[in-house]
Amino acid sequence: MRLLLVFLSLCFLGTVHAQDSIAAHYKIYNVKSKQLISVDKIVTDMNNADVLFFGELHDDSVGHFLEHKIFEALYQTYGDKIALSLEMFETDNQLVLNEYLAGKIDEKRLAKDARLWNNYKDYRPMVEFAKANKLTVIAANPPRRYVSIVSKGGMQPLLELSKEAKKLLPPLPYDTLPGRYREKFFETMKGSPGGDNPKVYYSQCLWDAGMS
């Protein structure tokens, strides 16, 4: 598999409040070539890769702005062959999301029924772009109630769910990723409540499997 890793050097010139004003406040630096590059260059380089890894934090407005710019550029290259998959939306909200994209419900109803995150404004431009261009938007995250079941009772209770419930989950049993990933998880969670509990790790793997 050909991979393309993107490392971003973000240089802030002042406080940024709106996405429209962000463009002048960041630079994209290619650590391999030691050169500044553009979003268009990233998209061009993706012709030689199968996967683009874009590291982000949920509350990083600049990161989400860049994701949106890459999404737009990908659309210019690939058209309706692309889709948007979002962790924010749980699989049991796919119908609600589809109804919003189709114009059947308004954004206020979407926010209420889909339990949007507090910083939805950072993701909103991508959703609106997808809506305007009739692109598929995927509710990718397994419902939190099932993740909670695993964190409390392990993976076995998932097998006892109804067929309808299982449709909202990745194929069972899902991969629990032994090896370095597991080791890194417990290293990171060390000292946290439940950090040494394998059931908590299995619940993380359910999230991963659902969004992969």
Which sequence ranges carry the predicted segments?
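Zymogen propeptides
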Residues: 34, 39-75
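N- or domain-start disorder-to-order transition segments that initiate the globular core
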Residues: 8, 17-49
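Solvent-exposed loop/turn segments at secondary-structure junctions
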Residues: 57-61, 89-93, 143-147
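A substrate-binding/cap region within the structured catalytic cores of diverse enzymes
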Residues: 95-212
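Acidic/histidine-rich, surface-exposed loop or edge segments in extracytoplasmic proteins
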Residues: 23-24, 47-57, 106-111
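Sec-dependent N-terminal signal peptides
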Residues: 3-13
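Short internal beta-strands
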Residues: 82-90
